[in-house]
Amino acid sequence: MTQVWAEWKKEVIHKGIEGRGIPNVAVAADWDGDGAMDAMTSFDNGVTVFRGPDWKTSRQVTRFSDAYHGERKLRTSCIHGCLMDVDGDGDLDFLGSNQLVFWLECPDRPFEQDWTFRVIDEQILGSHCLTVADVDLDGKLDLVANSGRPEGTPYPNSIVWLKVPSDPKSGTPWQRKVFADGDAPGGSHYMGVGDVNGDGLPDVACGAKGGEKFPGGEWFAWWEQPKDGSLPWKKHLLSDRQPGASNILPADFDGDGKIDYFATRGHGLGALWFRGPSFEAIEVDSTIVNPHSLALGDLDGDGDLDAATCGSQLTGKVVWYESDGQGKFHRRLIGENQGSYDLRLVDMDGDSDLDVLVAGHFNRNLVWYANPAKKAIMPFPGKASLWQGYEMREFSLDQRTCRVVRPKQAAPGRPWVWRARFWGHEPQTDRAMLERGWHVAYCDVANLFGSPDAVR
C-alpha cells in the first residue's frame, strides 16, 4: 500500500499576548465531554483552558495571585505541567510547576467554574519537569519532579517522586521520596521514566544543561530503582559531554528488546540516541537549534516509535524523526518559525493519528499541527503490468498518459521521482531509484512548459 503525505497544517489555539507571560506547557484532554479535544496552558498569572475544536471559548480557570498566599513568589506562568486524575473522579486534573508544585482540581463544569488550587510540595524548588508514572507499582500514578535549584530548598540538585495521599483534597502533604539526593547538579531539565535494566521496576533518566551559571551540568544520566525500595537510587552516567542537555525519553528504537534513550540538547544543538544496553551515543541530528521539547509516538502509523521536537527560539523548526525500527532516523519538517518549551503528541482532531501540540515560549502562542491525512492508493487505477520487474500501473489523467512504478520496499518517507516526458529513456537511473525504495511516476506535461497546470 502506498501512503501519500501532505504538509502539516498549523492551527492556532492562542495567538499570545505581549507582556502577559510565556506559555511553557501544553496539555490536552476532552474536559467538557463533547467529543472534541480541549487544550490548556499557563500565562497571564494563571492557567487557561481552551475549548475545541474551534478554540473560540476560553477561560482562565485559576489566577495565581488569588489562589496562593504562601511564602513563594509565583511567576506569571508555569515552567511545566502534566495531567493526572489526582482525586480519582474520572476526569483529568492539571499539575503545574511555578516556584512550587501544585494541582488544580477539574470541576464538574470546567469552562464555567474555577479549578481549585492545592499545593503538592513547596519545599522542592526548580521543578523544570513534572511527569507521571506508577513508580512503586501499586497500581496508582505518582508524580516525578526535579528540585534543580542549588539553594533556596532543603533538597538542592535533586529529583524526587511524590505519592498522592489517600485524600488529596484534605491538604495532606504528598509523600516525598528523594531518589536523586544532591547528585543531579547543573540545570536539570526533563525526566523520562521506564524500566531500563529489565528488572521490572521503573527507572528515571534526566538531562541537565551546564555552563558558568549551572556548574556540574552538561550530562544525561539515569537512576536505577532498587528492589528493596531504599533511597537514594544508584546513578548511572550516560554522558557528561552534552552541552545544553535537556530532554531524554526511553524506548526500544532498534528492535533488540533492550531499552534505548532518545535525547535532545535544548540549550544547545542536536538530537541523539543512546543504544542500550551499552548506551553508545549516536548522533541523529547535529544541526537543529535549541530543541527544548521532546515526545515519542508512532507518527506515521508503521508500528514503531518516532520522535518529535521543536526549537525554543522564534525561528525554531518543528521536526519529527522517522524511525525505521532498526535504529536509523530520518528528519522530517513539520513547521518553521515556531518556538517551543513543551511539545505533546495528541490526536487533536479525532482522526486516529497523532498530531503535534506546541507551547510557543517566545512566540507566546499555543498551536497544533495536524498530522497529514494518509491516503491509501491501492491499487492505482488502470492497467497493471511489470516494468523491469517492478509493479506498474498505467492510466489517464486529463487525457494524459500516466505511469506509476512501485519499489519492492519503500524507503523511509516514501520518496518519489517524477518524470514529465520521455518515459524509459534512462532505465538505468529509474532502476537505481527503485532499488533504493523510490517510486517512479510519469506524466507527459512537457507542452505545458512548467505552468501551474503542469504542477497540478
Residue ranges, per PLM feature:
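Short beta-strand element of the alpha/beta-hydrolase
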Residues: 412-422
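Beta-propeller-forming repeat regions
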Residues: 4-376, 380
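A domain-start/cap signature at the N-terminus of enzymes
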Residues: 375-412
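Active-site-proximal beta-strand/loop segments in catalytic clefts of secreted hydrolases
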Residues: 407, 420-422, 443-446
